Amino acid sequence: MSAFDTNPFADPVDVNPFQDPSVTQLTNAPQGGLAEFNPFSETNAATTVPVTQLPGSSQPAVLQPSVEPTQPTPQAVVSAAQAGLLRQQEELDRKAAELERKERELQNTVANLHVRQNNWPPLPSWCPVKPCFYQDFSTEIPADYQRICKMLYYLWMLHSVTLFLNLLACLAWFSGNSSKGVDFGLSILWFLIFTPCAFLCWYRPIYKAFRSDNSFSFFVFFFVFFCQIGIYIIQLVGIPGLGDSGWIAALSTLDNHSLAISVIMMVVAGFFTLCAVLSVFLLQRVHSLYRRTGASFQQAQEEFSQGIFSSRTFHRAASSAAQGAFQGN
């Protein structure tokens, strides 16, 4: 029966693999605790790969720390405001100095205008009588008033020519009628008086008014020129015995069969009529310009008062009167 107990498939030598000396040696070796296990303690760990340094600057990159903006202090605000005020003050001082310089230049220009040599009337250099006035429309008269001022100057010239023609007409009248010697004498007197008086009494005031925008000069012109228009009306009528060869005097010569003398006197009467019409027209033009300037009679009074009180002649006269009154007492 023992023969049946034998395993035919069994190894004749019963070998236990776990009884192998190499295995038992490993299993009997002391095992360290799990806590003492260090996977990085092996000497055969991964080798370290050297890092290749990039070419370039040897200085490391430095990040600038960001600085948050701080609120300005009150002292800084005050200092900035003071600096702005100082700059504005310097700018104002510079502008004031520039204005003062321009004002001095303007005063020098005006002074140079005043010291210019008189050029009217245009007399030759050898004449012993020198010019009495300075007249330059382009320099002294504003551009808006130059045209009307020249027209008034031409009217004065026409006025002078008409008076001279009136003298010749009265001479012809006197040559045809010996009883008209008074008219001829008065015509000479009118020519000698009215020619310079018209220039001084109404042309020069309007010239000064346009030059300096003086209300008082405007009122002087209006008053004298209105009287001049009245004289023109009397002259164009031609009342005999007044030295005017107007329409009545010219028509009266037709009875004496002096046609040539009558024609000459009618031409002069036409000149007087033309002067009267132009005077009325120019008076209206000047008055309209005067109204646009906004001047008034009160302003003219103030200018007249300032001119009187600032006059050296008035001061001397007042001082002389005061001294005389004091000595009399």
From Swiss-Prot:
Subcellular location: Golgi apparatus, trans-Golgi network membrane; Recycling endosome membrane
Sequence segments annotated as region (Disordered): 1-21, 51-72
Membrane topology: Multi-pass membrane protein
Top-level taxon of origin: Eukaryota
Transmembrane segments: 154-174, 182-202, 219-239, 263-283
Region annotation (Interaction with SLC9A7) ranges: 203-218
Gene Ontology CC, one term: Golgi apparatus
Expressing tissues: Widely expressed.
GO biological process terms on file: post-Golgi vesicle-mediated transport; protein transport
Keywords: Endosome, Golgi apparatus, Membrane, Phosphoprotein, Protein transport, Transmembrane, Transmembrane helix, Transport
Residues modified as Phosphoserine: 319-320
Spans within the Lumenal topological domain: 175-181, 240-262
Quaternary data: Interacts with SLC6A4 and SLC9A7. Interacts with SLC9A5; this interaction regulates SLC9A5 cell-surface targeting and SLC9A5 activity.
Protein task: Functions in post-Golgi recycling pathways. Acts as a recycling carrier to the cell surface.
Family, similarity comment: Belongs to the SCAMP family.
Protein name per UniProt: Secretory carrier-associated membrane protein 2
Source species: Homo sapiens
The organism's taxonomic lineage, starting at the top: Eukaryota, Metazoa, Chordata, Craniata, Vertebrata
Gene (UniProt): SCAMP2
